[in-house]
Regions:
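Active-site/ligand-binding neighborhood in enzyme catalytic cores
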Residues: 112-203, 208, 229-239, 357
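Conserved flavin/dinucleotide-binding core of flavoenzymes
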Residues: 14, 22, 210, 280-417
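Dinucleotide-binding Rossmann-like beta1-alpha1 core, especially the glycine-rich loop
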Residues: 48-114
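Glycine-rich active-site loop/strand segments that organize a redox cofactor
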Residues: 37-64, 157-165
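Central helical "cap/lid" subdomain
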Residues: 206, 215-273
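N-terminal Rossmann-like FAD-binding beta1-loop-alpha1 element of flavoenzymes
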Residues: 2-28
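Glycine-rich FAD pyrophosphate-binding loop
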Residues: 20-45
């Protein structure tokens, strides 16, 4: 089949790569002048690579690790306490982290058993950890990573449906040696001329015989099927001339887009804390292991999550306030060159960072995108519960399975109704 993939982030490129390997003719349309979407790597003035977007590849995230091995894109450990950051002078032990997480989970189960509904991440932490819960390192880590208001995010989605729940917890994460964008760049290199940059799609329609994609310049492209792999706000802005399945409509209505910012800071000197969390705002900074396995890279990476935190850091006005807060938290920091701020709320092709499950989320949403809507499948972190680089890859693979259903239906009946 001829298949159009809209979006050249990790989700779309994974789908395109797998579809080509299975003998399909693919075309990938990307609005930007680069591939990678929310993976975006640049070098700071001192030569250190910084990630403007997605950062961590965790040990049990097998889909993206399998893909990186296939493509020969190596992974290096960050060697950072991702889940056990220093907060107010201490970080929790491995055992305390596991015990606290179990305490919150069991408290949540009890709340739900008592008939409570629409229980938020905030509610679960408050009930489990008591009046000082907002100062607890486990709370501070989770709400930072949510990139959303924890009062609006489903606790059940966060604690009861973890896709890695059956895997051992390992407090480490990896990064691609050449920058996290390097995986997307290698996929695009192998796909070659099939990837078309600066080709934003505006509308998509379908019939029993195929799909039609309308570009921003008014031109149209035709194919047998399509995969839409764009961020949630962009998906909502596309003109779709067809209906989604009821399950897909419901699942999308249960997603809320978060926002986040990153700060890359070249340095000449800093303290030795590799993972330091703000005590009152949802941001943290870390320093990754270098490729020599001994030293740290000459840069700090910082992540801030949620609209309230970005407003408090005045990111709309530039990096100045955030840099001041960072230097107050790390008084030994000596900055060596220009810092690099990336505010994803300002990005026209994402309009935010990544999504979360709202209080209306239900477990039925989990399977909504296993099937296509006619001849169209969907990919992207918003189609599942993994808001990670691996989640993007998993969603691309899921979309391939959905497209194969289109192919089977086409072969047996001449096309979807």
């Amino acid at each position: 089949m001829r298949i159009i993939v809209i979006g050249a982030g990790l989700a779309g490129l994974t789908a395109a790569w797998e579809l080509r390997k299975r003998g399909h003719e693919v075309s990938v349309l990307e609005a930007r002048a680069r591939v990678g979407g929310r993976t975006w790597s640049l070098r700071l003035g001192n030569g250190a690579i910084t990630e403007r977007g997605g950062e961590y590849v965790f040990p049990t995230e097998f889909a993206i690790r399998r893909l990186s091995a296939e493509l020969g894109v190596p992974i290096l450990s960050h060697n950072v306490r991702y889940a056990r950051r220093t907060v107010d002078g201490r970080h929790v032990s491995f055992a305390e982290l596991e015990a606290t997480t179990e305490q919150i989970t069991e408290t949540l189960r009890g709340m739900l058993a008592d008939g409570l509904t629409r229980v938020s991440v905030e509610d679960a932490h408050r009930e489990a950890l008591g009046p000082d819960y907002q100062q607890h390192p486990v709370y501070r880590r989770m709400v930072t990573s949510l990139a959303n208001d924890p009062n609006l995010v489903s606790a059940a989605s966060a604690f009861l449906y973890d896709p890695d729940a059956d895997q051992p917890f390992i407090d480490d994460g990896g990064r691609f040696v050449g920058g996290n964008q390097s995986l997307a760049i290698e996929l695009a290199r192998r796909l070659g001329a099939a990837v078309r940059l600066e080709h934003p799609a505006r509308a998509i329609d379908q019939s029993s015989s195929g799909v039609e994609v309308t570009l921003a310049d008014g031109s149209t492209l035709h194919a047998d099927a399509a995969v839409i792999a764009v961020p949630l706000p962009i998906l909502r802005s596309l003109r779709l001339g067809f209906a989604l399945t009821p399950g897909q409509d419901a699942a999308l209505s249960h997603r809320i887009m978060g926002t986040a910012a990153k700060l890359g800071v070249p340095l000449a000197a800093v303290d030795d804390d590799i993972a330091l969390q703000s005590t009152d705002l949802s941001w943290w900074s870390w320093r990754s292991l270098s490729a020599d396995g001994e030293h740290r890279i000459p840069a700090l990476s910082c992540f801030a999550g949620s609209r309230a935190t970005l407003d408090a850091l005045h990111t709309e006005a530039g990096p100045g306030r955030w840099v001041s807060e960072l230097q107050a938290l790390r008084p030994e920091l000596v900055i060596d060159g220009d810092v690099l701020l990336t505010d994803w709320s300002d990005d026209p092709w994402t309009r935010g960072s990544y999504s979360a499950a709202s209080l209306d989320w239900t477990p039925a949403d989990l399977d909504a995108f296993d099937v296509p809507a006619g001849r169209v499948a969907f990919a992207g972190e918003h189609t599942g519960l993994e808001q990670t680089l691996n989640g993007a890859v998993v969603s691309g693979l899921r979309a391939v399975t959905a497209i194969e259903a289109v192919e089977r239906l086409t072969e047996t009946s001449g096309g979807p109704a």
